[in-house]
């Protein structure tokens, strides 16, 4: 029995019995109380019904109390504030969560959620102009773990990387690679400001020399550009793929922006929107703070995005007549929808916060009100080494690459640490701190908890084989787990699937990391109590029954930590 789902279903049943209400399943909530003074769980059902029935919330709450107090797992019910219903759950109903985790793992981790969604989640999408810096890793980990969570709760998910291979930065990449090519042929070169001075492009120039000799120098400029562009983008994309794979990240699809141009997808969407009266020729006001004398107030083709809540209409052509980046966005969104997605999630960097309304406008303009759009912004990572901030810039050639940091600390540390703060808050990544073996290092703290559970079970197998055999056979008395600390950690274990559900609902993977830190903290507290008071130890040589029950608790903690690590993409450690 999942106590959260069970209580929700019983509340829904009571609502139908009292008010014949058939529509509350998706709006009733079950929350964990913040302290033991307000029970274990609470619900807003009375206020929902009161608003619909035009009744005082407390009156409604009392009616629910009369029915729900008869449930076998409810110890008491209190009505608080304007009509919150607070439930205290019987200890044995919490304790059974241990049995469910150990013996019915599949059912315990099953989540009751609407699964009729086909989600396309786009993340990373770093320009293929060089190695990925550590700032990209945050969006990469956030997107990857969010996709894992959504898949775990049952959604169909496509993980996508949008390859920006058609913009001005690609032109700069080609120019830089051509200079490195000339350098490989023996010329002395200088990399102009605005290009990419990093040494990572030197091997690309050298490979071009091996394949083409000096033929590129005498080749038609257009043909040379095409060859070098395709070659450079492929090499940089291979570099990015490798960086991502070393972080444990694999996309289902790498989608080329250039393919939208080559296949006429942009012309197709522009024609469609023009026929709908959503493309017009006009001018845009100068940006705030812009010197108007320098503002290009030209007539251009604009998309009526303000009709759908955007702050201004968006140009679909550049001054030179080529398609704008936004025009590609239009075609790309339509392509995703045409492929069957009914929920689009975009994971973007802090410099793309203005894209939220634009993307929503695109989908609405396509007449796809049923398509849900979410844009999640990942704030900056402040990378620190020995207390000194490290500036990150491909163009300056001095940035902390994902590869460098991965080789320094490992993928597991990067993945976990990137989730220790909510995605829309800045994150400090301290290279020294993440390698410390202390409570101040969250990943170490959780891994150490897993290691200790392994140690407990190994010690019991050696010192108390009879207790261990009983535990292995599933013969244990969970009612012996009755201390306040034990019940407290069991409640947290029971809330694991609820944490997954909420993380999926609000697109907040950081909840998983924080949950694991909290679980580890409670476990370490019990362990430390055992150092001072032998009654709190997991293995008590003169108490077979209690030891057997606590082995079950230790194993349940181990399984939930491992489940959390699986979602985050971290390998649990068995020894340190």
From Swiss-Prot:
One of its GO biological process terms is:
arginyl-tRNA aminoacylation
Q: Where is this protein chiefly located? A: cytoplasm
Motif 'HIGH' region in this chain: 126-136
- Spell out the subcellular localization from the entry: Cytoplasm
Q: From the UniProt record, which GO molecular function terms apply?
A: arginine-tRNA ligase activity; ATP binding
Name the catalysed reactions: tRNA(Arg) + L-arginine + ATP = L-arginyl-tRNA(Arg) + AMP + diphosphate
InterPro entries from the entry?
aa-tRNA-synth_I_CS, Arg-tRNA-ligase, Arg-tRNA-synth_N, Arg-tRNA-synth_N_sf, ArgRS_core, DALR_anticod-bd, Rossmann-like_a/b/a_fold, tRNAsynth_Ia_anticodon-bd
* Family per similarity comment: Belongs to the class-I aminoacyl-tRNA synthetase family.
Q: What name does the UniProt record give this protein?
A: Arginine--tRNA ligase
Origin organism is: Rickettsia canadensis (strain McKiel)
């Amino acid at each position: 029995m999942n106590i959260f789902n069970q209580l929700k279903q019983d509340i829904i049943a009571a609502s139908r019995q009292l008010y014949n209400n058939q529509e509350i399943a998706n709006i009733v909530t079950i929350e964990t109380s913040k302290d033991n003074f307000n029970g274990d769980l609470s619900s807003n059902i009375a206020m929902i019904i009161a608003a619909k029935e035009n009744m005082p919330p407390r009156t409604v709450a009392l009616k629910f109390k009369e029915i729900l107090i008869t449930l076998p797992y409810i110890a008491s019910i209190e009505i608080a504030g304007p009509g919150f219903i607070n439930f205290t759950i019987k200890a044995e109903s919490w304790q059974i969560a241990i049995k469910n985790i150990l013996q019915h793992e599949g059912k315990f981790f099953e989540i009751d959620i609407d699964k009729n969604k086909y989600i396309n989640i786009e993340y990373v999408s770093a320009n293929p102009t060089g190695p990925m810096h550590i700032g990209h890793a945050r969006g990469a980990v956030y997107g990857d773990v969010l996709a894992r969570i959504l898949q775990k709760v049952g959604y169909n998910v496509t993980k996508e990387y949008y390859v920006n291979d058609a913009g001005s930065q690609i032109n700069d990449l080609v120019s830089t690679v051509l200079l490195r090519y000339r350098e490989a042929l023996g010329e002395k070169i200088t990399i102009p400001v605005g290009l990419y001075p990093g040494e990572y492009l030197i091997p690309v120039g050298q490979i071009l020399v091996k394949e083409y000799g000096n033929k590129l120098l005498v080749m038609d400029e257009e043909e040379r550009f095409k060859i070098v562009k395709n070659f450079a983008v492929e090499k940089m994309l291979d570099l990015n793929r490798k960086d991502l794979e070393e972080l444990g990240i694999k996309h289902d699809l790498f989608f080329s922006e250039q393919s939208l141009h080559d296949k006429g997808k942009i012309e197709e969407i522009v024609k469609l929107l023009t026929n709908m009266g959503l493309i017009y020729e006009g001018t845009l006001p100068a940006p705030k703070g812009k010197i108007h004398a320098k503002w290009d107030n030209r007539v251009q083709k604009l998309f009526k995005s303000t009709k759908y809540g955007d702050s201004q209409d968006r140009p679909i052509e550049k001054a030179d007549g080529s398609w704008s980046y936004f025009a590609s966005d239009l075609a790309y969104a339509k392509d995703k929808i045409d492929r069957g997605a009914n929920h689009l999630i975009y994971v973007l960097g802090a410099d793309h916060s203005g894209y939220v309304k634009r993307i929503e406008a695109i989908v609405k303009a396509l007449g796809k009100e049923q398509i849900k759009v979410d844009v999640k912004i990942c704030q900056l990572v402040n990378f620190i080494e020995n207390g000194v901030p490290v500036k990150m810039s491909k163009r300056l050639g001095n940035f902390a690459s994902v590869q460098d940091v991965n080789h320094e600390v490992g993928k597991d540390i990067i993945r976990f640490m990137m989730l220790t703060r909510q995605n829309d808050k800045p994150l400090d990544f301290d290279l020294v701190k993440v390698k410390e073996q202390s409570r101040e290092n969250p990943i170490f703290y959780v891994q150490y908890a897993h290691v200790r559970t392994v140690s407990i079970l190994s010690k019991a197998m050696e010192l108390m084989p009879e207790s261990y055999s009983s535990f292995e056979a599933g013969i244990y008395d969970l009612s012996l787990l009755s201390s306040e600390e034990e019940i407290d950690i069991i409640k947290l274990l029971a809330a694991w699937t609820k944490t997954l559900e909420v993380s999926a609902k609000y697109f907040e993977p950081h909840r998983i990391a924080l949950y694991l830190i909290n679980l580890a903290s409670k476990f370490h507290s019990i362990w430390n109590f055992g150092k001072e008071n032998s009654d709190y130890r997991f293995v008590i040589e003169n108490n077979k029954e209690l030891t057997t029950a606590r082995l079950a608790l230790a194993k349940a903690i181990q399984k939930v930590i491992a489940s959390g690590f699986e979602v985050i993409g971290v390998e649990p450690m068995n020894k340190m």
